[in-house]
């Protein structure tokens, strides 16, 4: 689903011309380094939450997820702001075109919100999966991707050009992140985590040999 919607946004970018396509590419290449923080936190959080849920330490899992989100926001936010500030020099690695460099810097400033949304999205999706709450992230994420990344990038691109397409990216990440945060905050994952615990305990008890008297 994501790849198809991204191809739609890429097609919308290509319609704007070679310069827009180059700017799009250079900005994404920069952001992939920023996104490593969210990706790493998401993987680590999924592993740690899975272990804590398996041990029945649900409150500790909740605290750990909140701490991971907070640290991710600080680290990703600082790095993307730094990238936007140094863009006039950094982008000269790719091109000397002043228009491309200025547009890329604009996109990087827009990406501050994008990366903050990505932190919520990746960290919380991993955490929800680890608790057994797998359907909501898939359904909510798919709806946001189609609506904002796919349809939104096409419509906003026609009206506002490349910054409009970037706003569609921002909306997609932020909406998905907000939905995952809402899901976690209202503790809708708890029934799934408790179900996993019951199944584990039942499995352990069934494999425990009876004590001979």
List where the protein language model places each region.
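Short alpha-helical transmembrane segments in multi-pass integral membrane proteins
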Residues: 49-114, 155-213
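Hydrophobic alpha-helical transmembrane segments in multi-pass integral membrane proteins
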Residues: 149-155
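Short, loop-centered acidic/histidine patches that primarily coordinate divalent metals
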Residues: 142-143, 170
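Helix-terminus/linker motif at the lipid-water interface of multi-pass membrane proteins
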Residues: 3-33, 51, 89-98, 159
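Small-residue-rich hydrophobic transmembrane alpha-helices
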Residues: 23-87, 118-140, 151
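Residue-level hotspots within pore-lining transmembrane alpha-helices
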Residues: 1, 5, 13, 34-38, ...
């Amino acid at each position: 689903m994501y790849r198809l919607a991204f191809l739609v946004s890429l097609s919308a970018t290509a319609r704007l011309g070679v310069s827009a396509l180059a700017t799009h590419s250079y900005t994404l290449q920069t952001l992939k380094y920023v996104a490593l923080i969210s990706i790493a936190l998401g993987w680590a959080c999924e592993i740690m939450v899975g272990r804590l849920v398996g041990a029945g330490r649900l409150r500790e899992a909740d605290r750990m997820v909140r701490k991971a989100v907070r640290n991710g926001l600080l680290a990703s936010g600082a790095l993307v702001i730094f990238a936007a500030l140094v863009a006039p020099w950094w982008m000269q690695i790719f091109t000397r075109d002043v228009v491309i460099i200025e547009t890329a810097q604009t996109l990087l400033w827009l990406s501050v919100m994008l990366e903050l949304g990505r932190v919520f999205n990746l960290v919380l999706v991993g955490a929800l999966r680890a608790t057994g709450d797998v359907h909501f992230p898939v359904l909510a994420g798919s709806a946001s991707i189609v609506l904002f990344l796919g349809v939104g990038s096409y419509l906003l691109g026609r009206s506002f050009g490349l910054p409009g397409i970037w706003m569609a990216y921002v909306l997609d990440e932020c909406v998905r992140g907000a939905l995952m945060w809402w899901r976690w905050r209202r503790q809708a994952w708890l029934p799934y985590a408790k179900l996993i615990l019951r199944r584990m305990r039942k499995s352990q008890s069934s494999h425990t040999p009876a004590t001979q008297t």
